[in-house]
From Swiss-Prot:
Protein name (Swiss-Prot/TrEMBL): Muscarinic acetylcholine receptor M4
Topological type in the membrane: Multi-pass membrane protein
S-S pairs: C115-C195
Subcellular location: Cell membrane; Postsynaptic cell membrane
Basic and acidic residues bias spans: 270-285
Record's compositionally biased regions (Basic residues): 236-250
Pfam families assigned: 7tm_1
Main subcellular localisation: membrane
Organism encoding this protein: Gallus gallus (Chicken)
Purpose: The muscarinic acetylcholine receptor mediates various cellular responses, including inhibition of adenylate cyclase, breakdown of phosphoinositides and modulation of potassium channels through the action of G proteins. Primary transducing effect is inhibition of adenylate cyclase. May couple to multiple functional responses in cell lines.
Cytoplasmic topological domain residue ranges: 65-78, 139-158, 227-412, 468-490
GO cellular component term of the entry, any: plasma membrane
Tissue note: Expressed in heart and brain.
Region (Disordered): 236-343
Amino acid sequence: MHNLSAQPWQAKMANLTYDNVTLSNRSEVAIQPPTNYKTVELVFIATVTGSLSLVTVVGNILVMLSIKVNRQLQTVNNYFLFSLACADLIIGVFSMNLYTVYIIKGYWPLGAVVCDLWLALDYVVSNASVMNLLIISFDRYFCVTKPLTYPARRTTKMAGLMIAAAWILSFILWAPAILFWQFIVGKRTVHERECYIQFLSNPAVTFGTAIAAFYLPVVIMTVLYIHISLASRSRVRRHKPESRKERKGKSLSFFKAPPVKQNNNNSPKRAVEVKEEVRNGKVDDQPSAQTEATGQQEEKETSNESSTVSMTQTTKDKPTTEILPAGQGQSPAHPRVNPTSKWSKIKIVTKQTGTESVTAIEIVPAKAGASDHNSLSNSRPANVARKFASIARSQVRKKRQMAAREKKVTRTIFAILLAFILTWTPYNVMVLINTFCETCVPETVWSIGYWLCYVNSTINPACYALCNATFKKTFKHLLMCQYRNIGTAR
């Protein structure tokens, strides 16, 4: 948390001289920070800070509009980013410009009431930003470490409650103390032309707030991201693509064979074997007939009995699919084979290896002695295989989309955490130094470090665009006024 109590000129107050009067820390004298900038420097400062404020406002408005108009961006994680963009927008509109006025003028020209309101707004918004980052980090951590239980509770309503809690808690922590401390202690000790938090005038107290508001959250977020990264790498290793040689050796195929019909004169029927390979959701027919008795014609299937399919995808090559007669309500966990059904059982195995998915289906023939009604044809199993192939293809596509989405989220989180740490660390290091040496940090360095905290709000929208192609395309559509397909841009 950046802190206005540690302004660079405050450390020099004991030695300032105005009108041949040596001043100490006396509350009855109005002390104002010296203005050491030349006119050219003031113009440069105003231009740079004004440009940063404009870019911050435009960038965060783009983020908010993108999430609003593009359905692809309306996810729980992006709602957290929406909250963060709101905080950054407030900083761009108010905090940046008021602090620029303070720097250029060399003193606070707007009075005590505006000063306290600015400080309260600045601290509440900054604390809300940190808490939003913590929420994003914890949310991603639970998504990775508890993928089976946490997503069920990860609803839009829950996200809204967490965001509201972050803002309300930030307001309770800072606003009352900043606005009413002078009434609690009975007097205002902040000089008329200065603006800082009265109860943080002690450098040791300032450092304590920096520990609680910056260093501790940074440690927590870093630890969480390390766990997120390790869990993601573990997933990659688990689904690492095999070599070509291994894939050839482990090729899964789909075999189905109709049972041999037993008739009255014990003459065997022709057994037909159809081999179909299912790779990446595509079926390739390779029929081959093996005739056991010549002169016999293949038996056609005439029954129109329908069946329902219950499928559970697994790895480790474990068959988990069965076909049950229509109308049966057995649980897939306890399947039951109907002896009068045309098909006794279908086994399906889907093996996911990195970006390649291989599906194998096996139709187990009916038991010996089954009636003529239980024979299988060539065409019906092939149609079923294609249906399963379509399901497998759809599942692979969904997995790839989910993996790409997770990669975007993780990359975005890393970018905004890195930007937060890089921009907020210099100032908070100076706060640490100022605790032990009040005159060691030059005025200009203080101002630059303090402004870097604000620059974080400028960088965040760029992080979203660089790490998420959907954000980038939506930004482009909004800036170029191309609204036709903006709602579904990917």
